[in-house]
Amino acid sequence: MENTPQQQLDLIAQMIKTAQRRFYDDSPFYILWGSTVMIASLVQYVLLLNHNEYNAIGWAILIPTAILLQLIFIRKQQKQATSKTHIEQVLNHMWFAFGISLFIVLINANKLQLNTYPIVLCLYAISTYISGSALKINAFIVGSIICWIAAVIAFFASFETQLLLLAAGVLFAYLIPGILLRKLEKEAA
């Protein structure tokens, strides 16, 4: 028996809603990485202004801590795992590709030099735009647009200014949407 066009549309809408509800569970990741990158950027900015030779210490402490916390979150989610919709599977693959791409860019930062953070901002923009579009969450789309604007500016900015642009980018692309998702998750519960 074949579904009517309306039944097919209803099924797609239901899949999107299911993916949205599960996406709310990912709010800790956005809050974690948004706050981690924002704080590390601002710490490095302040230390650079004070001519501190250990200006990257925030990254050295915060990134490994965030990775450890993310692994704990993932393990907790895997214990509660259910089957994933097609949209969720595609988004998982997209985030995996984002992580690999980010890693490649960051390990080549010495070669990229002042182009590193503008490229990172573009990667943030692409990933949050795709997520926001797929799940119809406007906060991510707005955040991605802000990241793209910050990336364009960053290509012409000093390293210190790039740190501020990076902090602003993750504030709008990760932290604020993550907090909004958390709020929606609590309202849905």
Where are these predicted regions, by residue range?
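Hydrophobic core segments of alpha-helical transmembrane domains in multi-pass membrane proteins
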Residues: 56-63, 118-125, 165-173
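Selected alpha-helical membrane-embedding segments in polytopic membrane proteins
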Residues: 21-107
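C-terminal ends of transmembrane helices
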Residues: 18, 69-84, 126-133, 178-185
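Terminal transmembrane helical module of multi-pass membrane proteins
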Residues: 130-189
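Membrane-proximal helix-loop-helix units in multi-pass membrane proteins
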Residues: 85-144
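N-terminal juxtamembrane cytosolic/stromal segments of multi-pass membrane proteins
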Residues: 1-26
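Helix-loop junctions at the membrane-solvent interface of multi-pass transporters
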Residues: 40, 46-47, 76, 111, ...
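Membrane-helix interface and helix-disruption motif detector
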Residues: 50-57, 108-116, 158-165
